[in-house]
């Protein structure tokens, strides 16, 4: 009987029982007790914890009601990047996706794909250590997200402790946080009763709920989490499955919820059959989806296929056909972007399309206006391409009013009145004003200070706009001349914020050549291209002096990008900006040339597993790479050596089975010493 147990024993008993009920309800979709019995147990649990606060544990079901509010979200760096997916919009895209895979793997046989609905919510990473939830984070930019642990702990179907005993000691689960349609309706009814603004759609409601600083608010929102993949995995107690679908089944055994519509199919044809089936079920599902995700099911194939800069080669999101509605074009305004691009923006009669109200849509350029034959006053068809980006795809010619007006493209910049030029072969017209143009200046400054560029903490978009409007900043180097006194007088600043900003600007002066190149905003030079340029040329001076042939010798730099880089460094005002930044103290460490084929471990594949005591995992990986080795995350027949730390797990077993060379940490350190000696 329960009264024969101590409070601690009874509490453990109740927690285990409630966790089992949650598993039956959320994972197996098979509730075994009435709500009244569940509620009775929760009340008893709360009574015991209130009377014995020392017995309250972090993984107690009571912790799902939320704790103290936060002042801000901390940043979290993903140990394994959370990449996005490439998209397919039609059957040809899917067939091409399968062909790319077969060509790369050099196979002709059918490929097994794991198929699941693409949930329309917010991507989240949840880290478990020794079975206990220790951290949750948003995707962010894929490398750095926000710590939302306290909020995720309140989600009803997220286990605070994993079931069973055979899970890895560190296990990162990735999935989507969503809100059901019924939950969304209930939430909006409550919002309206409180006199608050209702949410536009379930996705926005879910995202807004997760980013509440007060977890009690999140706890009151009807959120659910569904797992779709693994991220970081360390110290496996039992081997993970050799397919994506079997690994998801393991997650389910450990208490993590999965989509009920998961299937494994053979080849692109069956994938398309699954896509059409889910499309027909779409309106019957309890939650919003915007497509289907297909992943190569075989993990070894995934590893061989690898990744491109932003997405895996072995997965694709097949989006549903865009949703369309009719609206009226009220006006066209012309916006100026960071690179001077003049973009016509359609102002529309607000129209509800695919879950959101659309009042603006891009018309891209003059060529698109001509193609559509569009006039102000026309009735137009709006499409949300990929359920995201509003586009005007056609006009309804027989509804054109008598007073419809032609759209007149400006001859001079609508912001600074500089001349507009349109180069031969380009569809985009551009303002020639450069940093003289306030619109370009604002966007260029935002780019310069952004996280992927110089990463100036506290220098947000609104403050940059204020600084440009006040003419305190006309060039990037002006940031480093800002004084505390004038900054303190700006809206929402104050002396403390001004001091922090000046210190952050000083800190940002130490950067890398790649980040500096990216910060300059050279057309079509993203992070990866900037990194390739830096590693190839080693110095800024070498890049400045490079001709077109030399630039095209850089990995991933073609004719067009080479021309943009070449032109940028031939413009005198760009060189003046660079000179001013260097004079202000912006600097970076010298880059050593990587002669990979001459390095001692060139061409060798290493795998790290288990716990290292002298060097941490990242340091060991960096050291191996500096010696020319490729460091892989999994053991295969192509592996040359496995470095096995403590509690090595299944990778060690697999390496031994394959006859792969195995060394311990001491062996690795001795090797490093020999190679450097």
UniProtKB/Swiss-Prot annotation:
The answer on whether this UniProt entry bears the keyword Zinc reads: yes
Q: What Gene Ontology molecular-function terms does this entry list?
A: DNA binding; DNA ligase (NAD+) activity; metal ion binding
Enumerate the SMART domains for this protein: BRCT, HhH1, LIGANc
Q: Which cofactor does it need?
A: Mg(2+); Mn(2+)
Q: What class of enzyme is it?
A: ligase
**Pfam families (alphabetical):** BRCT, DNA_ligase_aden, DNA_ligase_OB, DNA_ligase_ZBD, HHH_2, HHH_5
Q: Name one GO biological process term.
A: DNA repair
Q: Which residues form a coiled coil?
A: none
Q: What is its EC number?
A: 6.5.1.2
Q: Where is NAD(+) annotated to bind?
A: 35-39, 84-85, 116, 139, 176, 295, 319
Q: Which GO terms describe its cellular component?
A: cytosol
The Swiss-Prot or TrEMBL record describes its family as follows: Belongs to the NAD-dependent DNA ligase family. LigA subfamily.
Protein name listed in UniProt: DNA ligase
Q: Which organism is it from?
A: Pseudoalteromonas atlantica (strain T6c / ATCC BAA-1087)
Q: What is the lineage of its organism?
A: Bacteria, Pseudomonadati, Pseudomonadota, Gammaproteobacteria, Alteromonadales
């Amino acid at each position: 009987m329960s009264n024969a147990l101590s409070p601690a024993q009874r509490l453990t008993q109740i927690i285990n029982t409630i966790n089992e009920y949650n598993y039956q309800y959320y994972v197996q979709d098979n509730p075994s007790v009435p709500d009244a019995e569940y509620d009775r147990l929760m009340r008893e649990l709360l009574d015991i914890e209130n009377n014995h606060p020392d017995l309250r544990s972090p993984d107690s079901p009571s912790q799902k009601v939320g704790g103290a509010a936060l002042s801000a979200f901390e940043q979290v760096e993903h140990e394994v990047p959370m990449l996005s997916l490439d998209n397919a919009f039609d059957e040809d895209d899917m067939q091409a996706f399968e062909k790319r895979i077969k060509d790369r793997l050099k196979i002709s046989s059918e490929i097994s794909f794991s198929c699941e609905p693409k949930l329309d919510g917010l991507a989240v990473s949840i880290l478990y250590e020794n079975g206990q939830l220790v951290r949750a984070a948003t995707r962010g930019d894929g490398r750095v997200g926000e710590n939302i642990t306290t909020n995720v702990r309140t989600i009803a179907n997220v286990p605070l402790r994993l079931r069973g005993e055979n899970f890895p000691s560190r296990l990162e689960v990735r999935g989507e946080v969503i809100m059901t349609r019924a939950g969304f309706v209930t939430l909006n009814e409550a919002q309206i009763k409180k006199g608050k603004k209702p949410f536009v759609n379930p996705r926005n409601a879910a995202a807004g709920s997760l980013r509440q600083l007060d977890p009690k608010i999140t706890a009151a929102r009807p959120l659910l989490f569904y797992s779709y993949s693994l991220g970081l995995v360390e110290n496996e107690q039992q081997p993970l499955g050799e397919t994506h679908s079997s690994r998801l089944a393991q997650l389910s055994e450990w208490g993590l919820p999965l989509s009920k519509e998961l299937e494994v199919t053979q080849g692109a044809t069956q994938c398309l059959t699954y896509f059409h089936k889910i499309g027909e079920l779409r309106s019957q599902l309890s939650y919003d989806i915007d497509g289907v995700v297909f992943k190569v099911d075989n993990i070894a194939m995934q590893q061989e296929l690898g990744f491109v800069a932003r997405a895996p080669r072995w997965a694709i999101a097949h989006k549903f056909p865009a949703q369309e509605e009719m609206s009226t074009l009220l006006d066209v305004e012309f916006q100026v972007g960071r690179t001077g691009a003049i973009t016509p923006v359609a102002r529309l009669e607000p129209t509800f399309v695919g879950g959101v109200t659309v009042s603006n849509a891009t018309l891209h350029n003059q060529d698109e206006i001509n193609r559509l034959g569009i006039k102000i006053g026309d009735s137009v068809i709006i499409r949300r391409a990929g359920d995201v980006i509003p586009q005007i795809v056609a006009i309804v010619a027989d509804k054109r009013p008598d007073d419809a007006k032609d759209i007149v493209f400006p001859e001079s910049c609508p912001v600074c009145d500089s001349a507009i030029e349109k180069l031969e072969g380009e569809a985009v017209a551009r303002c020639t004003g450069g940093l003289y143009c306030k619109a370009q200046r604002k966007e260029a400054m935002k780019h310069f200070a952004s996280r992927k560029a110089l990463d100036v903490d506290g220098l947000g978009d609104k403050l940059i706009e204020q600084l440009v409007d006040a003419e305190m900043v006309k060039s990037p180097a002006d940031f480093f001349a800002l004084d505390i006194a004038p900054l303190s007088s700006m809206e929402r600043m104050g002396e403390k914020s001004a001091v922090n900003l000046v210190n952050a600007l000083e800190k940002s002066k130490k950067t890398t050549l790649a980040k500096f190149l990216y910060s300059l905003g050279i057309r079509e030079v993203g992070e990866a291209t900037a990194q390739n340029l830096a590693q190839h040329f080693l110095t800024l001076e070498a890049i400045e002096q490079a001709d077109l042939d030399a630039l095209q010798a850089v990995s991933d730099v073609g004719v067009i990008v080479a021309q943009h880089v070449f032109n940028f460094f031939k413009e005198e005002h760009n060189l003046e900006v660079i000179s001013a930044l260097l004079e202000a103290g912006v600097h970076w460490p010298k880059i050593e040339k990587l002669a990979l084929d001459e390095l001692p471990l060139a061409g060798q594949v290493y795998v790290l597993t288990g716990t290292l005591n002298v060097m941490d995992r990242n340091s060991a990986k960096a050291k191996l790479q500096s010696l020319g080795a490729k460091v892989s995350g999994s053991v295969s027949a192509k592996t040359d050596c496995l470095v096995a730390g403590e509690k090595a797990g299944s990778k060690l077993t697999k390496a031994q089975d394959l006859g792969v060379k195995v060394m311990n940490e001491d062996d690795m350190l001795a090797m490093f010493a020999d190679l450097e000696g």
